[in-house]
Amino acid sequence: MKSRIKDCFNASEEEFSDWKWQYRNRITTVEELEKLILLSDTEKRDIKKALEVFPMAISPYYASLIDPDDPECPVRLQAVPQSAELQKSSWELEDPLCEDQDSPSEESCITHRYPDRVLFLISNRCGMYCRHCTRKRRVGNREHDYSEKAIREGIEYIRMHHEVRDVLLSGGDALLVSDERLDWLLGELFSIPHVEIVRLGTRAPVTLPQRITPELCEILGKYPSVWLNTHFNHPKEITPEAKKAMNMLACAGIPLGNQSVLLRRVNDCPVIIKNLCHELLKIKTRPYYLYQCDLSFGLEHFRTSVARGIEIIEMLRGHTSGLAVPTFVVDAPGGGGKIPVGPNYLISSSDTGVTLRNYEGVICVYPEPAEYSSKCQQKCTICDKHPGLKSDTGLARLYDEENDVIALEPEGLERKQRF
């Protein structure tokens, strides 16, 4: 397939290995696509309709991974539009995670949801437009590119909010900016005393591994605490080119993680996920999250049940090393944030002990200590410096002996207003 694509583009090996050539020559039309993979007349018509809603862009490299004769190829399903994208369920939203709601302004690049960290969108460009993208409202849309002014305002927001210790650069793709711009941005962020780490969210190692160059690795490696999370969804994506890219990053001292999305017909299988996680560990990449597919517009055909995700984790836990088991999370709609869900191994608990089961179904009892109080026993004042850790809200409030609270009630309970 690679040779076929090179011939189609009349490209040399040097050109094919150049990330800028790859980006310039992304496949964006049905006419270009049908030269590479088998398309029926119905598929051509459906793709053209889907492109009216969300554009297509496939790097020649990623296209080379597609089985041209298999409509069910897991790479193809992630890259090629389908008519199902035009079907909107009642639950689907343009901004299902309410990121815009947690931004300082409509034009801002910043989403500040969690207390000590922010999402900083720096690009709306990608090596490929994933069909399961949760930011379809922004990605590939020139109207939502980020100006120099917006980027500088984002930096200033972080500088003024001393609680922010962790910055996640994303987009689009955080690596789809120039080396010079990324170097400048990292320099600005690490000049802020309270910024401890910067994370990069990128799918470049998967869809555009040529982007990982010695020059880029030198830039990333010179800063004290840059982390990188990428997005492999299927073992077929872990190619020699991808392995080389990840190894270059690892050799530059960059800690690597992977965030997969659970996708129907792509990877909703415990064997596929297990193989993927094993292959990731072999390239020094920790399987970090397995996401339930978001409720973005036109993604109903990709979504699995949450129960299927839990089932997959159940089939991993104990059957492979803990390093190979990602955390399954639902990024809750309405801005609820990431909620971890998984199998329940705690059967019951009491003052004397807990009853547990293991992955084999073995049931055992673990005794609790005879005398123990959940009230902190430390004779220090460290918690006074972190008021957010005190248990005056949420479920923790019920267990705090200093709070005279036995139940938490939502505001506006109907039965409380009857009399």
Curated annotation (Swiss-Prot):
**Residues recorded with modification N6-(pyridoxal phosphate)lysine:** K338
Q: Does the keyword rRNA-binding apply?
A: no
- Keyword Nucleotide-binding assigned to the entry: answer is no
- Its Enzyme Commission number(s) read 5.4.3.2
UniProt-listed NCBIfam families: KamA family radical SAM protein (TIGR00238), lys_2_3_AblA (TIGR03820)
- GO MF annotation list: 4 iron, 4 sulfur cluster binding; L-lysine 2,3-aminomutase activity; metal ion binding
Q: Which residues bind [4Fe-4S] cluster?
A: C126, C130, C133
Q: Give the induction annotation.
A: Transcription is induced at high salt concentrations. Forms part of an operon with ablB.
Q: Which Pfam families match?
A: LAM_C, Radical_SAM
User: Catalysed reaction per UniProt?
Assistant: L-lysine = (3S)-3,6-diaminohexanoate
Query: Residues in domain Radical SAM core?
Result: 112-323
Q: Which UniProt keywords apply?
A: 4Fe-4S, Iron, Iron-sulfur, Isomerase, Metal-binding, Pyridoxal phosphate, S-adenosyl-L-methionine, Zinc
Say which enzyme class the record assigns.
isomerase
Q: Which SUPFAM superfamilies does its entry note?
A: Radical SAM enzymes
Annotated family: Belongs to the radical SAM superfamily. KamA family.
Tell me the cofactor note. Binds 1 [4Fe-4S] cluster. The cluster is coordinated with 3 cysteines and an exchangeable S-adenosyl-L-methionine.
- Chain residues that bind Zn(2+): C269, C376, C380, C383
Q: Which cofactor does it need?
A: [4Fe-4S] cluster; pyridoxal 5'-phosphate; Zn(2+)
Protein name per Swiss-Prot or TrEMBL: L-lysine 2,3-aminomutase
Q: What does this protein do?
A: Catalyzes the interconversion of L-alpha-lysine and L-beta-lysine. Is involved in the biosynthesis pathway of N6-acetyl-beta-lysine, a compatible solute produced by methanogenic archaea that helps cells to cope with salt stress.
